[in-house]
Amino acid sequence: MQIFVKTLTGKTITLEVESSDTIDNVKAKIQDKEGIPPDQQRLIFAGKQLEDGRTLADYNIQKESTLHLVLRLRGGMQIFVKTLTGKTITLEVESSDTIDNVKAKIQDKEGIPPDQQRLIFAGKQLEDGRTLADYNIQKESTLHLVLRLRGGMQIFVKTLTGKTITLEVESSDTIDNVKAKIQDKEGIPPDQQRLIFAGKQLEDGRTLADYNIQKESTLHLVLRLRGGMQIFVKTLTGKTITLEVESSDTIDNVKAKIQDKEGIPPDQQRLIFAGKQLEDGRTLADYNIQKESTLHLVLRLRGGQ
């Protein structure tokens, strides 16, 4: 049968092969056509790097399938991997290495099984089948290694109704992961969940470790109500601003919306409702602020008075 091999330069090579051909055989055919030594060739299909001893049939490569040819650069490059203990490991890699390959190298050096490793670069968790090049990881880049702890830890999630949910998590779980676990238990879609810890709303891409959330910590779950509501903010000049908000918005969120509309920095804003100054980490629901409520905005003058 015929298969195609596409190079990084965009050139496509046509090869005559059989399903029973091994990856070694295919690399030899590429060498015959293109003069590239097999030890400099890496073949990728469906996002997987193909191993020399396996056959095309093993990978379900059929007629007119397209393989991608990536060259192993002689000499490769060095990258660094920093662990939570602060130790830095140096690895010899190539841009075409997959994240699996990198985890295997870390295992060789440190003895940590790949299934206990999570690698983070530029705030993103790296997926096994992708390559360093896919993530634009270049020479002397630093990856962060977070360990998946066996057995993990328990945390609690308290809802506004007072119900407490217990979750099994790991420090390396992202907030998205936690919301997915809450959905599994309670059926609440992640896009309706807001999680608060220590007065801060937690961002989806960050991990529990990023927020220093440890075993038996309690998170607060606030629901984003679909459609939200309008409230009014009255300034000392008598001007009234209308804002689109949700009960689960924190006072910080409201100040940010006021900044968007009026250009007043949040640190110069004080919001008053029912004679009380509102605290940043709390939500509108905490203060029983409902649709069409009016807040009063007082400016903090720089330097105080």
Curated annotation (Swiss-Prot):
Its main location: cytoplasm. GO terms for molecular function: mRNA binding. There is a cross-link at residue 76 (Glycyl lysine isopeptide (Gly-Lys) (interchain with K-? in acceptor proteins)). One of its GO terms (cellular component) is cytoplasm. Pfam families: ubiquitin. The keyword Signal does not apply. The keyword Nucleotide-binding does not apply. It is found in: Cytoplasm; Nucleus. For the sake of clarity sequence features are annotated only for the first chain, and are not repeated for each of the following chains. Belongs to the ubiquitin family. This is Polyubiquitin. It comes from Avena fatua (Wild oats). The lineage of its organism: Eukaryota, Viridiplantae, Streptophyta, Embryophyta, Tracheophyta.
